[in-house]
């Protein structure tokens, strides 16, 4: 199973004794509505969790098929549906106003999913933090920057939307198991800047590269979450030390 969040959620579900079946794009075409319907109806799952890149039409088709078959459908969105140059934190009912292609794409997915099924679960996620490089998470970003520059330069002014992958996976499981359909925002950052997060990760993982602060005006671009509990960064990160 590929991606950043999917393997973590699959692991969390298996801890609950839930069988997990991956979608093999080499066998089930995502651009063929009949194939999409056939696969879902043959599997007869309780839940379909869509965390992959793909067209909004694919997402909407899955949502529609799930609604017609009484299957819970989850789509993981992103905080990037909001314009990060504007002040936050952003409430769940704020109209998406992304200016970049990725944010607009995810917002379009949301719109088409809701049109296809008002019973869908949509969970917007922030920048995820894993345990090691190797996927699209913050630590991997740090290692790639360190290879390019010999150091990691991060903002000491911007407060990003973040959560640990393990906490996101747990929240997604609880969302499907215990909450009603709707739009949710999973936020795990109590208010740490990216530099503060990086120094705390440095203290935890003992990176072999320096962390350098980049000073800029303070800006809070987190999401507001008052619906579902998400593990906070400060629960897992020690106080930062000078890297």
Residue ranges and their predicted role:
Residues 19-31, 214:
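A short beta-strand-loop structural module common to alpha/beta enzyme folds
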Residues 148, 169-174, 178-219:
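Mid/C-terminal beta-alpha module of Rossmann-like enzyme folds, strongest
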Residues 1-16:
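N-terminal Rossmann NAD(P)H-binding glycine-rich loop of SDR-like oxidoreductase domains
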Residues 86-123, 130:
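Catalytic helix-loop patch of NAD(P)-dependent Rossmann-fold dehydrogenases
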Residues 114-160, 167:
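NAD(P)-dependent short-chain dehydrogenase/reductase
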Residues 30-68:
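NAD(P)H-binding glycine-rich loop region in Rossmannoid oxidoreductase-like domains
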Residues 207-243:
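C-terminal amphipathic/interface module of NAD(P)-dependent oxidoreductases
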Residues 23, 51, 73-79, 123-125:
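SDR active-site strand-loop-helix element
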């Amino acid at each position: 199973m590929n991606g950043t969040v999917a393997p973590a959620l699959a692991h969390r579900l298996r801890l609950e004794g839930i069988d997990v079946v991956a979608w093999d794009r080499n066998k089930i075409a995502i651009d063929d509505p009949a194939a999409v319907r056939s696969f879902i109806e043959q599997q007869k799952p309780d839940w379909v969790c869509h965390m992959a890149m793909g067209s909004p039409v694919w997402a909407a088709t899955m949502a529609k098929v799930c609604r017609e078959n009484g299957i819970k459908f989850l789509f993981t969105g992103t905080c990037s549906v909001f314009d990060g140059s504007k002040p936050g934190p952003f409430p769940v009912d704020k109209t998406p106003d992304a200016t970049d292609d990725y944010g607009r794409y995810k917002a379009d997915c949301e719109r088409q999913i809701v049109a296809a099924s008002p019973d869908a679960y949509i969970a917007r996620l922030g920048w995820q933090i894993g345990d090691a490089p190797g996927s699209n998470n913050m630590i991997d970003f740090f290692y790639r920057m360190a290879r390019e520059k010999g150091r990691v330069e991060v903002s000491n002014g911007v407060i990003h939307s973040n959560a640990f992958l393990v906490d996101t996976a747990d929240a997604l499981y609880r969302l499907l198991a215990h909450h009603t359909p709707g739009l949710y925002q999973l936020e795990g950052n109590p208010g740490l800047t990216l530099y503060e997060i990086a120094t705390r990760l440095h203290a935890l993982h003992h990176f072999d590269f320096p962390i350098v602060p980049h000073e800029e005006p303070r800006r809070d671009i987190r999401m507001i979450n008052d619906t579902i509990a998400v593990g906070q960064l400060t629960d897992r990160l020690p106080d930062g030390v000078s890297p």
